[in-house]
């Protein structure tokens, strides 16, 4: 009798659980397996980062039957930009402030939730960071997250309990993490952000995936020569810098775009822009400034330098190369090349031989006026005179948003096409009001060495497209106009489909070969995350996080025109299946700010200008350029708190809303508070009664 009870209990546990425990061991072999499509094991699905799934149950013929299988409300979340993982029927994702959840991928039931308490750990760094994360990693039964405050945390995938934790940054510095960690060969690697808020010297670090112990670190730019260089690569790089660059950090932070290449046992690191942006300040005598805006290949076991390719020598526009690096076998000149594909901010699409870093081709995928072309013999861009704002200012395409930002592109080996969300908008690069010799690096506020974040961006200033690109011919095959300007990454499948969410809240499927629009649904909020697909018991699912977020929201009216007002529209995780019957849950219609003018408030123009300076350094990253919120935080022009000096001080200086993610600015004196209030009232009045 006891044996029978034990047998029935064991059977119940196996059947009742949403997955068979331990069925898939996620390691190098499974992460490199392109044929297995039931799981989504890594940020880009596999090591190749193609975001291509071999699943084809949902295809060009059946996609019109797609419907909602389940959805999960996420009322405590704000920005949802991440890629979920799916392992044996369990979906894992990170939400706001790095809160991580495991969900039954069949039903949407939450199995566990892990809160790393990022707000508490962040301290003053909360002033300079966003709440969102692009994803997480999975390795041998552990979910590994990178918290926004700079920690790596390994979580038991079954229980949701912490296994180990390690701090990857100096918490006294203005560093944070929004990128997804990557795992390979028993290690987990992560970089960080903070180039605009600190005298930042970028680096990537690999840790033991079982213990969290540091394995190796690679610095992206050289430090002070007087301290000696860490390796020969840094000594080589230092020859490309001038002046006392180390006092400004140099930059190069790798906040996204790290790919493991198993065929060459190397890690490919896409590096960031300069700290500060303006090369006239950080390297006044010129120079290429290695390894800014580069792809750097490192030995996966030791972290030693192997080769590099620099996309923007002497970077001065925030044209970083932190975008995803996709691996593929491509035919060039009758030969099959182990290639990488990369579309950084600068507007060119690169195909590079990943065995040695040799440039194979590079062509423009959007409007570019800083360079005419890339010379294939030298591998260098041919710059257009004046683009470095040598005379103090210049209108240049693209803007710091780039032609392509971090939103993931996908590659379909069946069509041979890459699907890229692109942006077309310029920026006025200007440093006429800056003393280039006395400029000092920021510390917990924004400082780029150019005038930035001081104005609203009009609704018609930027456009966006979904571009299908042939990487061999280096030409457009098809494209679709998208709502401006912040649209998420793509997914492509063996069903001859491309899926993409949109800034206006639509989720759309296209024919991957022809670009024909086949299916769409409106989900009630702006979409900033890419979809994933997986299969359970022979049924294909597609899941997507919906929650407007990311740096594009700082663009004021350009982002606000969609009406995704802060705190109004619900955040959700949607999952679609063939013949899904659930109705899309209701969501409020688009809502727009209603600025409040106080007619008897006498605006002091000098105070308001000082307030603009403070706002551009400390507030616009969340509340939007020109005091126009793009939806990430409250629009201060309509906030009742900004009508009361005492209430405003209580929030801004005393930190009364710290628990909700509003940082504390204890350093603000009366002049800063009054300046901000006068600036907000000025911008509100402009909106109500005109300029």
What name fits each language-model region?
Residues 146, 157, 607, 646, ...:
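C-terminal capping alpha-helices of c-type cytochrome domains
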Residues 28, 590-614:
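Electrostatic cytochrome c docking/interface patches
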Residues 603-625, 649-654:
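Sequence/structural segment immediately N-terminal to covalent heme-attachment motifs in c-type
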Residues 40-44, 77-99, 125-152, 176-197, ...:
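Repeat-blade elements of multi-bladed beta-propeller folds
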